[in-house]
Regions:
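Class I S-adenosyl-L-methionine-dependent methyltransferase catalytic core
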Residues: 1-219
């Protein structure tokens, strides 16, 4: 549920129903409070369906006709959500502690089930970064597209600001906090892939940003 940002975006959109999940019991409690707040603000015109579990444990047979599915799966060893916290054993990185197990029992099956849950014109967007483990890069993006190639519609780069680090990371030669180094670090931006899939081969959500075709470029 993206720490609640996707839930918030839902209430700011024209969508009428939201489905989400999070295995962390503490953030889940916060989501419930957020829903109470937004429902009061919007007059209770929207409905939500949230589950305190991982995506692999959702009742997928009950989830159908989804118009838009967006997910950013935990990047295996890179994002260890709720580490040391209550019910950490429900997190995908804990349950599947080898890349191949994580891929085969969580990442790819959940992606397939998400695609299956779409309506005939629905879209699925997956933001995933190839994790690097002990110097080896695992091609999560390629593996996803290879599995769902018949429904692959395109890819876009998502611009992301640098994630903050603690002051202890930035020290000068004397061991003191180096604000200039921290400021320089925070100026950095990077690009992450968002892969786009749909059952509808004629759907093109990127058409509004296209200026020309490659064929026309060479004519």
């Amino acid at each position: 549920m993206g720490w609640g940002d996707r839930l918030t975006a839902f209430y700011a959109s024209n969508a009428t129903h939201y489905i989400g999940c999070d295995p962390n019991p503490n953030t889940f409690k916060r989501y419930k409070k957020m829903i109470e707040f937004w429902d009061k603000l919007t007059g209770g015109k929207k409905t939500t369906q949230i589950y305190n579990c991982g995506a692999e444990d959702l009742p997928w047979d009950e989830i159908k006709n989804v118009d838009c599915a967006f997910t950013s799966p935990p990047y295996f060893s890179t994002e260890r959500y709720n580490e040391g916290g209550e019910k950490e054993e429900l997190q995908s990185w804990f349950k599947f502690n080898e890349y191949e197990s994580w891929r085969d029992n969580f990442y790819l099956p959940v992606s397939q089930k998400t695609l299956d849950s779409l309506s005939e014109t629905g879209i699925m967007m997956i933001n995933i970064l190839d994790p690097k483990i002990k110097g080896k890069r695992y091609r999560s993006g390629d593996e996803l597209v290879d599995m769902l190639k018949d429904n692959f519609m395109g890819q876009v780069g998502m611009r992301i600001m640098q994630r903050p680090q603690g002051k202890s990371v930035f020290k000068d030669a004397d061991g003191n906090f180096d604000k200039a180094a921290m400021d320089e670090f925070m100026k950095r931006i990077y690009i992450e892939n968002v892969w786009y899939f749909s059952k509808d081969k004629n759907k093109d959500i990127f058409r509004h940003i296209k200026r020309n075709t490659l064929e026309n470029f060479f004519t």
